């Protein structure tokens, strides 16, 4: 089925839903395709303490549900589907989805976000879903009263480790450097938690486990200085080493940087293709916060409105 629209929004995180709210209120009748992970990264986040407007801690999935309801209430059509292919060579732009629909859009706002990075070692792939995860809130429950290893040193790793203490008997966080990049307040919480221990200057060499039943039994880690390998016994391994932008759909059609983030013109959400805008983590490698994503979604919507009214 072919569907035409003035504004097509790809992605349903804070950037996409904010763009939807603003374009809907401008009477542009936006269509939003919510993608493989409706709600974006916040749907796998438990406590949200830093989103303005809430005096008390709120849950990520609840916050995204509220944004989605708000977008619908002001006139956004939200489609449960995912994009397989785009053609940005000329207007109207064409977007093809997994459900077999073809959309023709006068403008597009790309809000496809970013996804978890993996270690890219064979044993990680072997045990993914059998003790290896990149989502503590999704899978932490399965490791109640067990020992867990978290890999990473940024906000994500420290937050995952802190959350996992709600379930695990012990959490070991291993980092390739001798200090964390995480916010000071998060580090303070981590160092004060008796369930958490830290191993500095180590990288994962191999995840080991059993085949019957398929499960993780430990992690071999290597000292980056001495190259000595040691074994940490555990039942689960959570990878928290950052994210990569979801831009594969647009390769060769839109300007990106060396890390495959979409390049936007300074101070705007305009991309190298006139009529195509990008907002949120897909074009932001510095801040990557829900509130900045929402703000850039608003910017994109206002810029789309001006573009269509030219």
Curated annotation (Swiss-Prot):
Keywords: Cytoplasm, Disulfide bond, FAD, Flavoprotein, NADP, Oxidoreductase, Redox-active center
GO cellular component: cytoplasm
Gene (UniProt): trxB
PANTHER family registered for this protein in UniProt: THIOREDOXIN REDUCTASE 1-RELATED-RELATED
EC number: 1.8.1.9
Name of the protein this chain belongs to: Thioredoxin reductase
InterPro entries for the chain: FAD/NAD-bd_sf, FAD/NAD-binding_dom, Ferredoxin-NADP_redctase_2, Pyr_nucl-diS_OxRdtase_2_AS, Thioredox_Rdtase
Organism, as annotated: Rickettsia felis (strain ATCC VR-1525 / URRWXCal2) (Rickettsia azadi)
GO biological process, one term: removal of superoxide radicals
């Amino acid at each position: 089925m072919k569907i035409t629209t003035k504004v097509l929004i790809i992605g349903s995180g804070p950037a996409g839903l904010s763009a939807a709210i603003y374009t809907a209120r401008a009477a542009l009748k936006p269509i939003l395709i919510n993608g493989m992970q409706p709600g974006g990264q916040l749907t796998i986040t438990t406590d949200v303490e830093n989103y303005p407007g809430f005096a008390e801690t709120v849950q990520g999935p609840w916050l995204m549900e509220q944004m989605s309801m708000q977008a619908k209430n002001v006139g956004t059509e939200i489609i449960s589907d995912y994009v397989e292919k785009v053609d940005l060579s000329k207007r109207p732009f064409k977007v093809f989805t997994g459900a077999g629909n073809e959309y023709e859009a006068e403008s597009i706002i790309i809000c496809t976000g970013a996804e978890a990075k993996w270690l890219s070692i064979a044993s990680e792939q072997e045990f993914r879903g059998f003790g290896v995860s990149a989502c503590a809130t999704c899978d932490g429950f399965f490791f109640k009263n067990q020992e867990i290893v978290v890999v990473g040193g940024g906000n994500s790793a420290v937050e995952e480790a802190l959350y996992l203490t709600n379930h695990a008997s012990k959490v070991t966080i291993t980092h390739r450097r001798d200090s964390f990049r995480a916010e000071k307040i998060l580090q303070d919480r981590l160092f004060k938690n008796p369930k958490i221990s830290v191993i500095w200057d180590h990288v994962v060499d191999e995840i080991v486990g059993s085949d019957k039943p398929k499960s993780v039994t430990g992690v071999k880690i290597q000292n980056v200085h001495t190259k000595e390998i040691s074994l940490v016994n555990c039942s689960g391994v959570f990878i928290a080493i950052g994210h990569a932008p979801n831009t594969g759909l647009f390769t060769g059609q839109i300007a990106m940087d060396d890390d495959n983030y979409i390049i936007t013109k300074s101070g705007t959400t305009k991309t190298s293709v006139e009529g195509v805008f990008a907002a949120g983590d897909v074009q932001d490698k510095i801040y990557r916060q829900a509130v900045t994503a929402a703000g850039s979604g608003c910017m994109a919507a206002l810029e789309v409105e001006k573009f269509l009214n030219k």
